[in-house]
Amino acid sequence: MVGGDTYSLNADRWGTLWPAATAIPFYKPIDGQRVITYFNPLYDNYEGYDHAVKVEHNYNVLTKQVEDLTAENESEFGNDPVWVNKDMMWIGGGYLNVIFRQNLPVKEKHLVSLVRDKWATAAEGEDDGYIHLEFRYNTYDDVTARQANGAVSVSYTHLTLPTKL
């Protein structure tokens, strides 16, 4: 964010972007907010930025940390079905980014989480040298037949990665 309603973007794949033009003049940027940005590139190497772009739309993305899954809290995270296309998951900017298809709620906000399964590893009795992550979704039994895409970016930078790869 530069100041006021003026902002720049640090893109996962495109580097730094300067919104030289926009189709969304009333967008209010929030410093540090991850967004999915639809844009058209205008210029390369523009005044210290990698690209100048025309922003067509910004979608704010939910950001979270990896949470620990245990026997005590497993029901809190739920295990309801949600559709994730493998082509709609990527790593960038220190985040695992996931776009998923969900049945929308009637009134209760759903919970989406990426959890580290410490319970399963402890139950097996030995550490296999891997971090076990699960994408969990809790509808709280509040769904409609109406579907929509959702997006979440989960920071993994606080995880201690195994040395065995």
Q: Where do the language-model regions lie?
A:
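Structural detector for short beta-strands of small beta-barrel domains
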Residues: M1-G3
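Extended, well-ordered protein cores
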Residues: Y7-G15
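Beta-strand/loop nucleic-acid-binding surfaces
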Residues: W14-F26
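Short nucleic-acid-contacting surface segments enriched for D/E, G, S/T with interspersed K/R
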Residues: I24-I36
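Surface-exposed beta-loop interaction hotspot
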Residues: N45-L96, R101
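Short helix-loop boundary/capping segments
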Residues: V84-N138
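An anionic, turn-rich surface loop/hairpin at beta-sheet edges
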Residues: D128-V154
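Conserved small/polar residues in nucleotide/adenosyl-binding loops
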Residues: T157-T163
